[in-house]
Amino acid sequence: VNGATSIHNLQIVENNSDNTYKHTGSWDDEGQEYLESVPVELIRGAVCNPCLIIDGTSVEFNQVGLDKKNNTQTVLSVSKEDIVKETVVYDDSYTIEHKFKNLPDKNIILVWDSGLLPSEKLIKDDLSYFSVYAQNQQSYEEEFLTSVNGQESFTFDDNVGWAGLKSKYFIKSITNHDYNNLKAKKVVFNVNPSKVIDGAQTVNVNMECHYGYQDLKGGSLQVSSYVGPIDMKHLNQEENKHLSQLFGFGWFVIGYLGMAVMWLLTTLYSIIPNYGVVCILFAFIIRLFTGPLTKKSFLSNQKMQAIQPKLKKIQEKYKDDTGKLNQEIMGLYQKEGVNPLGGCLPILIQMPLLIALFQVFRKTIEFRGASFLPFWITDLSQPDVIIQFEFLKNIWGINYFFGHGIALLPIIMGVVMFLNMKMTATNNINPSQASTMYIMNGFFILLFNTFPSGLNLYYTVYNILNFLQQKKLQKINS
């Protein structure tokens, strides 16, 4: 943290067990070059982080004195216009406490300017996650900045306990020290919609927390700031537990499945410290559970195929009597023990898990910068691009939806899916349906081209195992 008792520039400096930086990758000062080996920088050139506005006058604290320092914390203090600001910086924590004393009997606005710096190389993807959020007396609310559309500010009122700005992997938050009792009357996020990103690639969002003087007991205000990663290690710390709801994968079943998947992946990583290997092992584990469903689906399709001649006879015989036709078809299904939905249900049952996996691999910071093979996949949170097309970087539609290069894993996965579809189509579907499936297969290759390589690695291995099982079942059946 550089500057005085305000945060002017802030980098995330956390070390791995081998003393390397855990979180790396930042844009340079001009926002033109992405520097992959430097620590993540989230705040740059800020003026007011945080400062006060009293009766329309900004009170900034730019001179600092070291009060005390020990093995766990550093205390800095500064005075201006009889107001004392004390800042407590803790070791091994991204939380910083800000204490203001001797405040006048006037309404106070606590201001935090500068916003956040995007941290990802694929900046368009990163920006799609930027949002402002607040916890008020009623509920947690969030507004994504992609929905600005000319709106110059977002206001959260009804007594706000904590609020902040969130990117894909990092957050900047302000929390009232006793947020169950002391709450801001409102929090306003000022956004310049025509300049959400400035020349240095900063997402410009200015946060204002409004307090009534009658709420500030003894003329003091104490808040804590958290500027750091969205991970359970830090958000589960006692002082940050209220922020843990920012770490989620969706609503209801998807959210719970996502948390279960994340727990299993991190547990496996504690045994095998390579998330690439963990993704492969995880695919085997999931196949143990979904394998019986795949077998059931295959057998159901085989039964359906076996009764096709009888179905065609019924359809020809009762083509002019819809009621009788449906009755005879259902009777045939019952007689032959065929469930018309038997081939679809196993797939539908797996859908919540697939959605949860998608959320985990796209949103979890543990995969950011995690390497599988140093000569191929060096970041499981990014596509494994093997050929770059620099001229596509600034074409937003192509860049955002299909990337600006060719990734290898989606091609491997696409080939496996094609072989699987071809094997299935030969036995179960007509040529026109097969053609549609092949076109969809090509579309999935393009779509997965922008997905994290961790997700693609899992899904590729999963599809290979699925293909091998289908091949074995087909051989047994023949």
Role assignments for model-derived ranges:
Residues 1-242:
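Soluble non-transmembrane domains of integral membrane proteins
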Residues 98-100, 112-126, 133, 158, ...:
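Helix-loop-helix
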